[in-house]
């Protein structure tokens, strides 16, 4: 995928950071930016293989430079949650090997601006089970 806009490059940067962070926590990477037609996109699809039964972890990655409009977690509205859940249903239809897996929806968020010219790695906040299918 060609990243043309600054927003796309920023999103890719934080998704890559989140992927590395989650792998360091024991999750296994499966896919990034999985999308289905006009339905939506899943930022990261990870596996938690040590859990019994194994767990498919759908990860929404968020970042906000400033919090005057709320935190990055606040931006995951009920409508956004429904979109992620519907996209996950399409993902499961395309990947029947995960039919027996538990499904979990996590969020990895980053707050604050990147400091230009500084080698600063933002610290993630990882919320397991951030929302559920209900």
PLM regions with names:
Residues 37-40:
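Short acidic/glycine-enriched loop/turn segments that link adjacent beta-strands
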Residues 85-97:
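Metal-dependent nuclease catalytic cores in nucleic-acid-processing enzymes
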Residues 94-134:
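Domain-level recognition of nuclease-like catalytic cores that cleave nucleotide substrates
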Residues 1-33:
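Acidic-basic catalytic patches of nuclease active cores, encompassing PD-(D/E)XK
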Residues 22, 42-48, 52-65, 84:
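Conserved catalytic cores of phosphodiester-cleaving nucleases, focusing on short active-site segments
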Residues 64-88:
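Mg2+/Mn2+-dependent nuclease catalytic core
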Residues 35, 47-49, 110-112:
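A generic structural motif
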């Amino acid at each position: 995928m060609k990243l043309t806009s600054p927003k796309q490059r920023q999103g890719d940067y934080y998704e890559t950071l989140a992927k590395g962070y989650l792998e360091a926590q024991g999750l296994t990477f499966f896919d990034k930016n999985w999308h289905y037609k006009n339905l939506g996109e899943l930022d990261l699809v990870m596996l938690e293989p040590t859990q019994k039964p194994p767990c498919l972890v759908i990860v929404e990655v968020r970042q906000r430079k400033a919090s005057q409009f709320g935190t990055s977690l606040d931006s995951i509205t009920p409508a956004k949650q429904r979109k992620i859940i519907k996209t996950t249903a399409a993902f499961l239809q395309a990947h029947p090997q995960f039919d027996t897996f538990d499904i979990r929806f996590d969020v990895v968020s980053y707050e604050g601006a990147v400091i230009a010219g500084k080698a600063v790695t933002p610290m993630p906040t990882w919320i397991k089970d951030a929302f559920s299918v209900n």
